[in-house]
Amino acid sequence: MKITKKSITLLLAGLLCASNSFSQTYPKQDGVIRLLTYNTHYCKGGTDPGSLNDLNTKRFANILKALDADVVALQELDSAANGRWKRVLLDDIAKWSELDYVQVYGIAADYDGGSVGNGTLVKRWLPIKKIKKMKLSSDVGRILIRTDFEDFSFMSTHLDLDDKHRMNEAAAICTELDYIRKPVFLAGDMNDSHRWKNLAFSVFLEDFQIFSDTEGNTIPGREENTACIDYILFHDYKNSGIQNIESHIVRTITIDGQTVDLKDISDHYPVYVDIKIPGMSAIQQTTKNNLE
């Protein structure tokens, strides 16, 4: 076969297209830390009653793998429940994400011989300095998981459906800021929206600013513009200089050349924020790169 300049050009173009089909839909810039919040819906898919099985859990974990976040807040986890074959959902998600996460689980309430709660996943390159789990006032059980790192603190939560409880929980979280001497991120399913008047966000916005994408809704299938309830908020400390590089509510993602509609994975969309921390040392960056 005669090899011409045109055939080489076509070959290179084909290779480029093939490469792009496998590229990450939401690539991370060098030097950023990706924070993510995602309500798992107990890994039963995007509908109710859904199906509790390993396949749905693996599909969920595959989304985490593709998004490659460094710190993750997860809601609606179960652990050792009799009717759910005593699975530990956070363990399963971490294992099947293949990202070697450190796991932090917080029990919100007892459930069927086990428990339900929230979790935080942390890449091993980012050393945890302290963990605090704080019960929030609620009839059904709500918890705040605070994970402290060298340069910031990360709070993970899932607030109540009841308006009064939710406002009390927001006030308790804001009070916790008095005991933290570093910038704080709050991530989770707030069951509340910055678009709603005189509820939890009226409390939060006295101390936090919204860092995450708020374009549209975080619950699939909602036509009205009132279903943005999953957030990552930021409370600065001493003008830290932390930068918000980018944020997205992720509704579709391409994995191995296939587009995945995330409404089929959970009844919430994942939300991420990429941040940069001034002065991240070369040693920290090298450790991050080596472990990833």
Predicted feature locations:
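Structured beta-strand-rich core segments of catalytic domains in phosphoester-bond hydrolases
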Residues: 77-153, 245-250
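Loop/turn elements at helix/coil->beta-strand transitions in domains of secreted/extracellular proteins
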Residues: 30-33, 67-70, 99-102, 152-153, ...
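N-terminal, active-site-proximal structural segment of metallo-dependent hydrolase catalytic domains
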Residues: 2-10, 19-95, 110-112, 267, ...
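Generic enzyme active-site microenvironment
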Residues: 37, 73-74, 156, 187, ...
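Active-site neighborhood of phospho(di)ester-bond hydrolases with catalytic His/Asp-centered motifs
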Residues: 72-75, 104-107, 185-189, 212-215
